[in-house]
Design a protein with these regions (language model features):
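Non-catalytic extracellular/periplasmic "stalk"
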Residues: 1-45, 49
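Catalytic cores of peptidoglycan-degrading enzymes
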Residues: 38-184, 191-198
Protein backbone atom coordinates (compact mmCIF):
# COMPACT_ATOMS: atom_id res chain seq x y z
CA UNK A 1 0.00 0.00 0.00
CA UNK A 2 1.33 3.43 -0.95
CA UNK A 3 1.92 5.62 2.07
CA UNK A 4 1.16 9.33 2.30
CA UNK A 5 4.90 10.03 2.55
CA UNK A 6 5.53 8.18 -0.73
CA UNK A 7 2.75 10.11 -2.42
CA UNK A 8 4.25 13.39 -1.20
CA UNK A 9 7.67 12.32 -2.47
CA UNK A 10 6.30 11.39 -5.89
CA UNK A 11 4.39 14.66 -6.12
CA UNK A 12 7.51 16.59 -5.17
CA UNK A 13 9.59 14.82 -7.83
CA UNK A 14 6.91 15.47 -10.46
CA UNK A 15 6.86 19.13 -9.46
CA UNK A 16 10.63 19.39 -9.90
CA UNK A 17 10.46 17.73 -13.32
CA UNK A 18 7.67 20.08 -14.44
CA UNK A 19 9.61 23.11 -13.19
CA UNK A 20 12.69 22.04 -15.16
CA UNK A 21 10.63 21.42 -18.31
CA UNK A 22 8.83 24.75 -18.00
CA UNK A 23 12.15 26.51 -17.46
CA UNK A 24 13.64 24.91 -20.58
CA UNK A 25 10.60 25.74 -22.70
CA UNK A 26 10.67 29.34 -21.47
CA UNK A 27 14.40 29.57 -22.23
CA UNK A 28 13.81 28.26 -25.76
CA UNK A 29 10.98 30.74 -26.27
CA UNK A 30 13.22 33.61 -25.18
CA UNK A 31 15.99 32.46 -27.52
CA UNK A 32 13.55 32.36 -30.43
CA UNK A 33 12.41 35.90 -29.61
CA UNK A 34 16.07 37.01 -29.80
CA UNK A 35 16.73 35.54 -33.27
CA UNK A 36 15.99 38.02 -36.11
CA UNK A 37 13.30 36.09 -37.96
CA UNK A 38 10.52 38.70 -38.26
CA UNK A 39 10.06 40.69 -41.47
CA UNK A 40 11.33 44.22 -40.79
CA UNK A 41 8.92 45.81 -43.28
CA UNK A 42 5.39 44.42 -43.42
CA UNK A 43 4.07 43.28 -46.81
CA UNK A 44 7.16 44.61 -48.60
CA UNK A 45 8.44 43.32 -51.92
CA UNK A 46 12.01 42.08 -52.03
CA UNK A 47 14.45 44.02 -54.21
CA UNK A 48 18.12 43.05 -54.20
CA UNK A 49 18.96 39.80 -52.43
CA UNK A 50 22.11 38.73 -50.57
CA UNK A 51 24.99 37.81 -52.85
CA UNK A 52 27.16 38.97 -55.70
CA UNK A 53 25.63 41.46 -58.14
CA UNK A 54 26.48 44.43 -60.33
CA UNK A 55 26.58 47.46 -58.05
CA UNK A 56 23.93 49.93 -59.32
CA UNK A 57 26.18 52.92 -58.59
CA UNK A 58 29.69 51.78 -59.58
CA UNK A 59 28.75 49.20 -62.21
CA UNK A 60 31.30 46.79 -60.74
CA UNK A 61 30.69 43.33 -59.30
CA UNK A 62 30.29 43.51 -55.52
CA UNK A 63 28.88 41.47 -52.65
CA UNK A 64 25.50 42.78 -51.54
CA UNK A 65 25.55 42.03 -47.84
CA UNK A 66 21.83 42.13 -47.09
CA UNK A 67 18.29 42.31 -48.42
CA UNK A 68 16.67 45.42 -49.90
CA UNK A 69 13.00 46.17 -49.33
CA UNK A 70 11.81 49.03 -51.58
CA UNK A 71 9.01 50.96 -49.88
CA UNK A 72 7.40 54.37 -49.65
CA UNK A 73 9.36 56.84 -47.49
CA UNK A 74 7.98 56.81 -43.96
CA UNK A 75 6.94 53.15 -44.05
CA UNK A 76 7.43 51.67 -40.54
CA UNK A 77 10.47 49.48 -39.89
CA UNK A 78 10.12 46.89 -37.11
CA UNK A 79 12.82 45.13 -35.11
CA UNK A 80 13.32 41.61 -36.46
CA UNK A 81 13.94 40.43 -32.88
CA UNK A 82 14.34 41.76 -29.37
CA UNK A 83 17.65 43.16 -28.19
CA UNK A 84 19.65 46.27 -27.36
CA UNK A 85 20.32 49.17 -29.73
CA UNK A 86 24.11 49.38 -30.06
CA UNK A 87 24.38 51.80 -32.99
CA UNK A 88 22.22 54.75 -34.01
CA UNK A 89 24.13 57.16 -36.21
CA UNK A 90 24.74 58.48 -39.71
CA UNK A 91 27.31 56.79 -41.96
CA UNK A 92 28.21 57.91 -45.48
CA UNK A 93 27.62 54.42 -46.92
CA UNK A 94 24.52 53.36 -44.96
CA UNK A 95 23.01 56.75 -44.22
CA UNK A 96 20.94 56.72 -41.03
CA UNK A 97 21.59 53.34 -39.46
CA UNK A 98 20.29 51.33 -36.51
CA UNK A 99 21.99 48.19 -35.22
CA UNK A 100 20.43 45.85 -32.67
CA UNK A 101 22.45 43.34 -30.64
CA UNK A 102 20.43 40.17 -29.99
CA UNK A 103 23.12 38.37 -27.99
CA UNK A 104 24.88 35.17 -29.06
CA UNK A 105 27.00 37.19 -31.55
CA UNK A 106 23.88 38.16 -33.55
CA UNK A 107 23.32 41.71 -34.79
CA UNK A 108 20.67 43.04 -37.16
CA UNK A 109 21.32 46.21 -39.17
CA UNK A 110 18.76 48.61 -40.65
CA UNK A 111 20.18 51.14 -43.14
CA UNK A 112 19.16 54.14 -45.29
CA UNK A 113 16.35 54.90 -42.84
CA UNK A 114 14.78 58.33 -42.44
CA UNK A 115 13.22 58.98 -39.05
CA UNK A 116 14.64 56.95 -36.14
CA UNK A 117 12.49 56.11 -33.11
CA UNK A 118 15.15 54.56 -30.85
CA UNK A 119 18.53 55.56 -29.45
CA UNK A 120 21.70 53.77 -28.47
CA UNK A 121 21.22 51.76 -25.28
CA UNK A 122 17.47 51.26 -25.71
CA UNK A 123 16.10 47.81 -24.91
CA UNK A 124 13.63 46.91 -27.63
CA UNK A 125 11.22 44.08 -28.26
CA UNK A 126 10.50 42.00 -31.33
CA UNK A 127 8.20 43.83 -33.75
CA UNK A 128 8.75 47.24 -32.15
CA UNK A 129 8.80 50.19 -34.55
CA UNK A 130 12.40 51.43 -34.59
CA UNK A 131 12.60 53.62 -37.70
CA UNK A 132 11.01 54.58 -41.01
CA UNK A 133 12.05 53.78 -44.57
CA UNK A 134 14.19 56.48 -46.16
CA UNK A 135 16.74 57.22 -48.87
CA UNK A 136 19.77 58.36 -46.87
CA UNK A 137 23.42 57.60 -47.58
CA UNK A 138 24.60 55.74 -50.68
CA UNK A 139 21.19 54.86 -52.07
CA UNK A 140 19.40 55.02 -55.41
CA UNK A 141 15.85 55.04 -54.06
CA UNK A 142 13.78 54.74 -50.87
CA UNK A 143 14.19 51.31 -49.31
CA UNK A 144 15.36 49.43 -46.23
CA UNK A 145 18.72 47.67 -46.47
CA UNK A 146 18.53 44.85 -43.88
CA UNK A 147 21.52 42.84 -42.71
CA UNK A 148 22.14 40.06 -40.20
CA UNK A 149 25.67 39.63 -38.87
CA UNK A 150 27.03 36.61 -37.01
CA UNK A 151 30.29 37.34 -35.20
CA UNK A 152 30.56 40.46 -37.34
CA UNK A 153 30.22 38.58 -40.64
CA UNK A 154 27.17 39.30 -42.86
CA UNK A 155 24.95 36.27 -43.45
CA UNK A 156 21.99 35.82 -45.77
CA UNK A 157 19.03 37.37 -43.88
CA UNK A 158 16.62 35.33 -45.99
CA UNK A 159 17.64 32.20 -44.09
CA UNK A 160 16.57 33.84 -40.84
CA UNK A 161 13.27 35.11 -42.27
CA UNK A 162 12.55 31.67 -43.75
CA UNK A 163 13.21 30.12 -40.34
CA UNK A 164 10.64 32.48 -38.85
CA UNK A 165 8.02 31.45 -41.41
CA UNK A 166 8.78 27.77 -40.79
CA UNK A 167 8.42 28.32 -37.06
CA UNK A 168 5.00 29.92 -37.53
CA UNK A 169 3.94 27.04 -39.75
CA UNK A 170 4.94 24.48 -37.10
CA UNK A 171 4.19 25.99 -33.68
CA UNK A 172 5.05 22.74 -31.85
CA UNK A 173 8.59 22.73 -33.23
CA UNK A 174 10.83 23.25 -30.20
CA UNK A 175 14.15 22.69 -31.93
CA UNK A 176 16.93 25.24 -31.99
CA UNK A 177 16.51 27.59 -34.95
CA UNK A 178 20.20 28.04 -35.56
CA UNK A 179 20.88 24.30 -35.61
CA UNK A 180 18.01 23.32 -37.88
CA UNK A 181 17.92 26.15 -40.39
CA UNK A 182 21.56 26.61 -41.37
CA UNK A 183 21.48 30.12 -39.97
CA UNK A 184 25.16 30.25 -39.15
CA UNK A 185 26.47 29.33 -42.59
CA UNK A 186 29.26 31.00 -44.52
CA UNK A 187 28.75 34.26 -46.33
CA UNK A 188 29.37 32.80 -49.76
CA UNK A 189 27.60 34.29 -52.74
CA UNK A 190 23.98 33.52 -53.59
CA UNK A 191 21.82 34.19 -56.58
CA UNK A 192 21.97 38.00 -56.30
CA UNK A 193 20.62 39.96 -59.23
CA UNK A 194 21.13 43.60 -60.19
CA UNK A 195 18.42 45.87 -58.78
CA UNK A 196 17.73 49.59 -58.65
CA UNK A 197 18.36 49.97 -54.93
CA UNK A 198 21.64 49.74 -53.02
Amino acid sequence: QVTLRELDSNASQSSVVMTVLESRLFEQKIKKMMVPTQMPVANANLGSVFGWRIDPITGASALHTGLDFPATPGTPISAAAGGVVVTQEYQSEYGNIVEVDHGNDLISRYAHVSKVHVKKGDLIKRGQKIAEVGNTGRSTGPHLHFEVLVQGVPQDPQKFLNAGRNLLATPNNRTNLAATSGLYGSNGGSNGTPQAQR
